[in-house]
Design a protein with these regions (language model features):
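Catalytic cores of nucleotide-sugar-dependent glycosyltransferases that transfer UDP/GDP/TDP-activated
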Residues: 1-477
Length: 477
């Protein structure tokens, strides 16, 4: 019998997604299962989960838990897919909204409920894992509750916890009086996770978990420095942080079988990519041109993603002949910026303020270049998907971008993309210009570069093996 892993998170594909966390939680269990582990997953039952999945759910049990002065309902639904049990913690008061995340005291209460419900669900369903694998601040209180209130129970006495930091910037700050009222924590525990007169859920996960990981080797180093540590670098320097690179689901993201594309292609049969480019230009109202490179951005529109650099860079890229496609939602200032650019340059710039998976795949497939100049990037999945679909990434050397994109060397004809070091509009422009000039000036070299990028293997098998090794090490200790 393999190791039993209980993976707890706030989102998971294909059920609900706002970012890369969902992709990881959706793909890692299957990769671990292939290596012999027994994996189950728990997320909240959001009202936004599509009806097609809600119809699959089987009601397992329901009960009440004490949360502050209230008894709160906990329902448990289950979907069994490809040998993995996906559980959904149900409470309509907390999760029947038209959003996944919010802010303020209600957000704190939602995930306090979810944290306590997760441990109670394991008890009620007799799930006794070897490892509870937790993800980001929404689950950070679980290892604290486990140690303070559940560790004396026989079923939890030997359980180990792994806490993965997907993005250190979002830490889950809560009112101490509210947290104490909801979870009845002792003053010592509250003092341990105090953060400038707040309670910090990310800090709780880091302190109380048996092992802490993050999603790339470079990001693991960066968050231990004041520049990237989001004021927790001092704490992180006293923990061993394992940097395990995220992967992508190669079966789910495959340009040879992707039904969202008008034509299939692969590194050995790349002809269909040009058809995808032509279809994208037509669909978005861009000038039909094989010679003009299409540069794409698919991103949350926030300052983390380096979007302020584009203000100075985009006019120069258009002067070089590039077309620009942007897909994403976020801060109003960036939505206005890209909407204005598209209105002024309708044959060269297209902007869609939406989250559309099918369109994203069509953009990856139709783009020649993928721009990702992040201020910081814990891992990044977009550059991996871009390479998978033959779009050459132009990235800043930070976090997982530095770990996954090999800079192009025109003398040795090696590399899988273009990169720049400093957070600078000039450096972004120069790296983008190098990509555009290679595309326009040396088609043979570009085709070889594209083939290398598409051949790069960022599947989950290697990363799952690293997680499994960590789990086994924890269990033996």
């Amino acid at each position: 019998m393999g190791l039993k892993i209980f993976l707890v998170a706030s989102e998971c594909v294909p059920f609900i997604k706002t970012g890369g966390l969902a992709d990881v939680v959706g793909a890692l269990p299957a990769a671990l299962k292939k290596l012999g582990a027994e994996v189950s997953v728990l997320i909240p039952k959001y009202s936004m989960i599509p009806q097609q999945f809600r119809k699959e759910m089987q009601h397992i049990t329901d009960f009440s838990i004490q949360l502050g002065w209230r008894n709160q309902y906990v329902g448990v639904e289950k979907i069994h897919r490809e040998g993995i049990d996906f559980y959904f913690a149900d409470n309509e008061f907390y999760f029947k909204q038209d959003y996944v995340y919010s802010s303020g005291d209600f957000e704190a209460e939602r995930y306090c409920w979810f944290s306590k419900a997760a441990l109670e669900i394991m008890q009620k369903l007799d799930i006794v894992p070897d490892i509870i694998h937790l993800n980001d601040w929404q689950t950070g209180m679980i290892p604290l509750l486990l140690r303070e209130q559940y560790s004396a129970l026989p079923e939890f006495s030997r359980v180990k916890t792994v806490f993965t930091i997907h993005n250190l910037r979002y830490q889950g700050l809560m009112n101490p009086m509210l947290v104490n009222d909801l979870l009845s924590l002792g003053q010592n525990a509250l003092a341990q996770i105090e953060y400038y007169c707040n309670i910090n859920c990310m800090k709780a996960g880091i302190i109380y978990s048996d092992a802490v990981t993050t999603v790339s080797p470079t990001y693991a180093k960066e968050i231990c420095t004041p520049r990237c540590g989001e004021t927790l670098d001092g704490l992180l320097r006293h923990k061993h942080i394992a940097g395990i690179l995220n992967g992508i689901d190669k079966k789910l993201y495959n340009p040879w079988t992707d039904k969202a594309l008008c034509s299939r292609f692969s590194k050995n049969q790349p002809q269909g990519k040009q058809k995808c480019k032509s279809a994208l230009q037509t669909a978005l109202g861009l000038e039909q041109s094989e010679e003009r490179p299409v540069a794409a951005v698919i991103s949350r529109l926030t300052n983390q993603k380096g979007l302020d650099l584009f203000r100075a860079v985009i006019p120069g890229l258009l002067d070089l002949g590039a077309q620009l496609v942007i897909l994403g939602m976020g801060d109003a200032e960036y939505e206005r910026m890209f909407a204005d650019l598209a209105a002024i340059n309708p044959s060269s710039v297209a902007f869609r303020a939406e989250m559309n998976d099918a369109l994203a795949r069509q953009i990856y497939a139709g783009a020649d270049i993928f721009l990702m100049p992040s201020a910081f990037e814990p891992c990044g999945l977009s550059q991996l998907l871009a390479m998978r679909y033959g779009a050459i990434p132009v990235v800043r050397e930070t976090g997982g971008l530095a770990d996954t994109v090999i800079p192009y060397n025109r003398f040795t004809d090696e590399g899988t993309g273009f990169s720049f070091r400093n957070y600078s509009a000039d450096e972004l422009y120069n790296a983008s210009r190098a990509a555009i000039e290679l595309y326009c000036g040396d088609k043979a070299a570009w085709q070889r570069l594209t083939a290398r990028a598409m051949a790069a293997d960022f599947g989950w098998s290697r990363s799952a093996g690293e997680y499994l090794h960590l789990y086994k090490t924890l269990k033996m200790n």
